[in-house]
Structure formats: C-alpha cells, structure tokens
Amino acid sequence: MQIDVDPQEDPQNAPDVNYVVENPTLDLEQYAASYSGLMRIERLQFIADRCPPLRVEALKMALSFVQRTFNVDMYEEIHRKLSEATRELQNAPDAIPESGVEPPPLDTAWVEATRKKALLKLEKLDTDLKNYKGNSIKESIRRGHDDLGDHYLDCGDLSNALKCYSRARDYCTSAKHVINMCLNVIKVSVYLQNWSHVLSYVSKAESTPEIAEQRGERDSQTQAILTKLKCAAGLAELAARKYKQAAKCFLLASFDHCDFPELLSPSNVAVYGGLCALATFDRQELQRNVISSSSFKLFLELEPQVRDIIFKFYESKYASCLKMLDEMKDNLLLDMYLAPHVRTLYTQIRNRALIQYFSPYVSADMHKMAAAFNTTVAALEDELTQLILEGLINARIDSHSKILYARDVDQRSTTFEKSLLMGKEFQRRAKAMILRAAVLRNQIHVKSPPREGSQGELTPANSQSRMSTNM
C-alpha cells in the first residue's frame, strides 16, 4: 500500500521561526538600499532580531531611516532595542572596548517636534477632506482620502491608512483610479501581512478593463502595474505555502518594469521565484518556464548563485547544487518573507533531486547515491525510507546490500484492470444513451420544481410527467 502525502501539508514541514544566524555574509548597506519606506525599516528590524552580529548596525541604520518619517512610536521602539543590544554587547565576556559603541541619545526634541508636525498635518488634511465633501467633487474627495492614507502610513498607523485607501473606492471615476486604489490597499495589506486581502485586491485590479481587456503588447505603464500585481500575489501565495503558484506569479514579472522598492527588489523576485520553481516544477517545467525564459533570465543575472543552483539541478549535479544551497542558507534566513519557508523549500528541493536521480534506474547503489548527494549511507537510507512511505518513490530498500530497487509493476494485470474499468464505463454510457432514446421516443417531459421565491404557476414539489403514446 502506498501513502500519498502532500509535502506542503505535512506537519513536519511547519515553518521554523526559532532560528538565529551567526555567520551572515550580507552587505547591510547594499541590502537596505534596495528598499524604501516602511519595508526598509521592517527588514532591518527583522535582521536585527535574528542576527546578533548585525544587530547593532541594523538598528542604527533603521533608527536613521525612521527619523525621515513621522513614525515616532517606531523611533522610540528601535532606540530601546538599540540601547539593549549595546548593553548586551558591552556586557559580553569577550567584548572589546571600542569607540562609538554607545547608542545615540533619545532625541526628545525631534520626538516632540515630529508629533506636533504630524498632528498639524493630520488636522489640515482632515479639514481639506471635509471641504471637498462639502463641495461634492469626487476627484478631490478621492485625492483627499489618498493623502490622508499616505499620512497615516508615514506615521505608522497602518489600520487607519488601510481604511482611508479603501474609502477612496467610492469616489473612483475611472479604471485608472480603481487600479491606484487597489495598489494602495495591496501595499498596506502586505505590511499588515493580510494575505487574503492582498489576493482579493489583486483580483479586483486585474479585472479592471484597463488590465483585463488588453491583449498582446501592453504599454509600459500597464506592464509595470501587472508586474507589481503579480509580485504581490506571489508574496501572498508564498505566505500561504502554495509554492508552485507563487513561482508562476514571480515568473510573470517583467524585469524592465520591476521598480517598487516599497514592496520588494528584483533580487527578491529572482530568489523567491527560483527556489519555489526548484521545489515544485518538474524537469520539463523548469526548462521551459525558468531556464528558457528570456524575461526571468534577467532577474537571475542579479542572483548568479541562484542561477547556478538551478542549472546544476537541471544538469543533475546534485552535490554541487545542494552545497551551494547550504552556502546561501544563512542569508535566506534573514529575509522576512522567505525565512519561515526555507526549511520546507530545502526539503522539497532535496526530495525532488532524490526522486529525479532514481527515476531512470531499475536499481541504484546507495553508496554511489550517497556520494552524489554528499551524505552518508545511513542518512540517505532514512531519507529514502520516508520518501517510500509518502509514496513519492515506488521502490524498496535492500538494507543488507544497500541497494535501492524499483518495484516491478505487473503490466499485464494493470492492462486487464484498465480494460475492465473501460468496459464498465462503456456499459454505463450505453445504458444512459438507450434511456435517453426511449425518453425522447415516448415524448416524456419532466418538470422540475420551481425555485424558492420564483414567480409563476405553483406546481407540486414532486416532478410531474405525462406520457403520450403514438398509436
């Protein structure tokens, strides 16, 4: 008996959130420069929480970036974290006295001044919106809601920002306005990690005439919008652990129009799309949709390590492929959207490699197989046992000789079983056709009961029939 288990629903593949990265190879300045706004600050905070060696540097950078906004609460929170991280660094047994270890003092003057500015701007925007509503000018009201949403977003009040952007929907007078509203809601929903909301508004934006009715060549603006929508949908599918669907979304992104640092960078598209494709695509899909894709090749040029991993996997050089995956694992664990899925994706990629390696053979020497996967025979045997139990490999293991044998399928019995099933299906269809012919010949009419709440003549709940026989 074989057990068919969906690896994405396997409880063993639950996301691992308790991880610490001790040996990062990340260039923090270059990484932060790829993002803007709240996304940059949140990613730096995520790195600070998961990587002790980069904690102080990441928090200092986040502190300087947050001072360009009205987000006073986040400034105070980051400053508190930075003070704690600095004290931990100073109290460490192997701490080396350095200059500049002390965190900058809390800028109370900036805090007070920024709070006042934010309040004054909020009052002005609120007054303007009331005036627009008094004049009943839809376009002005829509812009007023958008401006108010932008201000709340700058202050870090995401729930109110979402409300303001959503309210603009009632005042949209064109498809362009609807798309702009959807993009604003999607952006805030990504920050809130409300993924069902993201997919809902991606669908709304794609159904607007400006996007849905265009075929063939799209103009630059439409292509940019579509790329943004596909990337947002990809993030949502990734969060839902629907990796194949996420890969398809990222593969539809256009490199020339991928410019929205408030959500993600082109490098993210390459990494997310590449790893999800490796974990879920078969050999033909990988060749057709990734390796031969002229558009996605441009993304992979930004991440040569991911590109090399994909090519090594396709060329069946699994030891090199898995070694390169391990080398970049620490950096992937510092990505706030990919980190919870790294273990699951790596497991699925390795399982797919094992399945692909064994598929052409009737038997395989597990010693050679272990060498190809850079592992021990005992560890390989455990992996293969799990794959057999899950029904992913139809084989049996000779533990004494350390040989993996493919199970022989009795083609004769299989053919007979298929023939019997087809015969039963033909009988069922023939009986249905004879019954239909008899009904038509005898002019039998069956009235269905009326639907609840429908108007017209009332008929009994049971179907009525009448038969007229031509003599």
Curated annotation (Swiss-Prot):
Modified residues (Phosphoserine): 448, 454, 463
Organ and tissue specificity: Expressed in the base region of the oxyntic and pyloric mucosae.
Compartments where found: Cytoplasm; Nucleus
The keyword Nucleus belongs to this UniProt entry's keyword annotation: yes
Subunit organization: Component of the CSN complex, composed of COPS1/GPS1, COPS2, COPS3, COPS4, COPS5, COPS6, COPS7 (COPS7A or COPS7B), COPS8 and COPS9. In the complex, it probably interacts directly with COPS2, COPS3, COPS4 and COPS5. Interacts directly with inositol kinase ITPK1. Interacts with CAPN8. Interacts with USP48. Interacts with ASB4; this interaction negatively regulates GPS1.
Comment text on domains: The PCI domain is necessary and sufficient for the interactions with other CSN subunits of the complex. Mediates the interaction with CAPN8. The N-terminal part (1-196), which is not required for deneddylating activity and CSN complex formation, is nevertheless essential for other aspects of CSN complex function, such as repression of c-fos/FOS expression.
Protein name: COP9 signalosome complex subunit 1
Taxonomic path: Eukaryota, Metazoa, Chordata, Craniata, Vertebrata
